[in-house]
């Protein structure tokens, strides 16, 4: 009888551990989903800022109106 009770106790402990691990896995998965949403949002914001920064930088190529006319012969 001792052996049967020990086995039942071990099975109960394993079931508890499995239940705890399943719950923890679900919670960790939810954290990963939330982090991915945050990363996606930051990525969009970064792309916007990069484009905004590019628009602010002066171009090294002068526009036609700013070019000095070529010398005439």
Curated annotation (Swiss-Prot):
Instruction: Give TM segment ranges.
Output: none
Q: Which Pfam families match?
A: SlyX
Top-rank taxon of the source lineage equals Bacteria
> Per its UniProt record, what Gene3D superfamilies does this chain match?
1.20.5.300
NCBIfam families to which the protein is assigned, alphabetical: PRK02119.1
What family does this chain come from, according to its entry?
A: Belongs to the SlyX family.
Name by which UniProt lists this protein? Protein SlyX homolog
Instruction: State the organism named in the record.
Output: Pasteurella multocida (strain Pm70)
Q: Which gene encodes it?
A: slyX
């Amino acid at each position: 009888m001792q052996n049967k009770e020990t086995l039942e106790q071990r099975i109960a402990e394993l079931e508890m551990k499995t239940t705890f691990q399943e719950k923890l896995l679900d919670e960790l998965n939810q954290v990963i989903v939330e982090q991915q949403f945050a990363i996606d949002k930051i990525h969009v914001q970064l792309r916007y800022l990069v484009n905004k920064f590019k628009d602010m930088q002066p171009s090294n190529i002068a526009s036609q109106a700013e070019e000095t006319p070529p010398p005439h012969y």
